[in-house]
Amino acid sequence: MILLRNLTLARAGRPLLEGVNLSLHANQKVGVTGANGCGKSSLFALFTGDLHQEAGDLELPPRWVIAHVGQETPALATGALDFTLDGDAELRRIESDLREAEDKHDGEAIAHLHMDYGHIDGYSARARAAALLHGLGFADADFERPVAEFSGGWRVRLNLAQALMCRSDLLLLDEPTNHLD
């Protein structure tokens, strides 16, 4: 559960939220609406730990994984499919650990990491990422294209694919339909 108690949030000295009390429970779907500049993105930044409240309390479950679709996607050299796969931090950690174990010829670690990889469904990760990209309108030929080559709208779709690839407890969508081509 997410709990805000008497929470106050300000930016540049301007109060965005004052004395807010709110409880959000698991499996709830909540929309946050408001005019430009009213603090929706700042609220999300509070949830991700990028901002801190001026007063009051924010309680998030300590082990929750948060996926966030921001409004901007940097121009990266990473290919679209790999960018999407980067959304699954545990997958990427296991892959990195596996490469390291293979370099060290550590058979026991390799065996354990392959078990972990199977447990998180790592063997189907590329297919799942491809399905996400197809669902968002990407063609197979786009998978290896660098993120930097896509227009802003297509980068927003890549951000969404990356967030959906994350096995998260909380998904924050910050204007996910803005700038779509």
What feature does the model see in each segment?
Residues 1-181:
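ABC ATP-binding cassette signature C-motif
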